[in-house]
A protein has these predicted regions:
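Residue-level detector of beta-strand structural context in well-folded domains
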Residues: 1, 49-51, 62
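A short, surface-exposed loop/turn module that caps and links secondary-structure elements
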Residues: 29-56
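Arg/Lys-rich, positively charged N-terminal/basic patches that mediate binding to nucleic acids
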Residues: 1-27
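Residues that form generic nucleotide/phosphate-binding pockets
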Residues: 12, 27-30, 92, 96-99
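A general secondary-structure junction signal
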Residues: 7, 43-46, 82
Length: 102
């Protein structure tokens, strides 16, 4: 399986304190085991999944996308787009996706 960490995701993890980095690492491993854990988004974010978790009484979200092999339904790739607190999360994610598509 090919796993890619997009720039906003990697920068957030790099700047986070070590305990949060370890929690994000655990979440990423859980998502790799079962990509359908997250909630599928609709509308502007169609195709994106968001997984929510709590750390130190704060809710965090992880946005990702994955692709399957159509014949065997094996997971071929996962792209992790963004991780962060709920505040402005979806607005920033939409802005990033719009910039990438241009």
């Amino acid at each position: 399986m090919n796993v890619t960490y997009k720039r906003p995701f990697a920068l957030y993890v790099k700047k986070a304190k070590k305990p949060l980095q370890l929690k994000i690492e655990d979440v990423v491993l859980d998502i790799q085991k079962n990509p359908a854990l997250g909630e599928a988004k609709v509308g502007d974010l169609k195709g994106i999944f968001v997984y929510k978790f709590k750390f130190n009484q704060q809710e965090y979200l992880v946005a990702y996308q994955f692709g399957k092999d159509q014949k065997h339904l094996n997971i071929l790739w996962i792209d992790f787009y963004k991780v962060g607190a709920h505040e402005n999360f979806y607005d920033e994610l939409k802005r990033y996706l719009k910039e990438v598509k241009q």
